[in-house]
Amino acid sequence: KRFDRIADQVKHPTLIFEDLDLTSYAQELKSFVRIDEDECACFLYTSGTTGTPKGVMLSHQNIVQNILHSIPRIPPVLLNQEYRVLSFLPVCHIFERMLHYLYMYIGANIYFAESLETIKEDLGHAQPTVFTAVPRLLEKFYDGIVQKGRAAGGVKAAIFNWALGLALEWEPDGQNGGFYEWKLGIARKLVFSKVKTALGLDNIRAVACGSAALAPRLARFFNAAGIPVYEGYGLTETSPVVTVNSDVEPGL
């Protein structure tokens, strides 16, 4: 019924997969679909950060290999859950483009943000297990969290500042020792669980961050808060991932 309502509102013909007899096209498709792995799959432009944007031809092999080698970086817990992602970065950028292919490969449910201004509300609706971000977005989240926490006043502000101080000292793999981890557990229950709920990230398992350098304090804060941030580096020409950290191979 929802599809019927949508069809009534658009001017273009609308087809639903259930109404199509795709099997009748199988032999016809086999006769002309001959895609070589080295053929161009997409033509994208670089961001122009260090010079004039240039066009980049990426082959099917480029993208497929990037997908296959990126999947092991997904925390294993995600593979056994309903995998929901929120997409807000432009798909004309290779970072988001490749991840969309990856999402389809593993059967993820993709939710699209309405706009940059509604990301917080969209996170609340989607309740994603993973989403992609850029450092500027995480910076805005961080600034808003700190401002609200300190504005609470009294005991609440004191507890928040204590938790914030702990978070900014976070080190991966329990390097700060058992006493620190015990205190962090308390901070997560008292403060950071509320932060995750406010951001719509109760179910989050990974935030893939790229396109610019991530400030160490942001990495420490969000990881301490139970919002794992994985920072990647890549180029349009490398389709795009070159390196990414993860808790599969510990290290920050």
PLM regions: where:
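Structural core segment of the AMP-binding/adenylate-forming
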Residues: 1-23, 30
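Adenylate-forming
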Residues: 3-10, 55, 66-73, 138-152, 193-202, 216-220, ...
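Conserved pre-ATP/AMP-binding loop-to-beta segment of ANL
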Residues: 25-45, 52, 78-84
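Conserved S/T- and glycine-rich ATP-binding loop of Class I adenylate-forming
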Residues: 40, 46-49, 85, 90, ...
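Conserved AMP-binding/adenylation subdomain of ANL enzymes
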Residues: 64-84, 91-189, 203
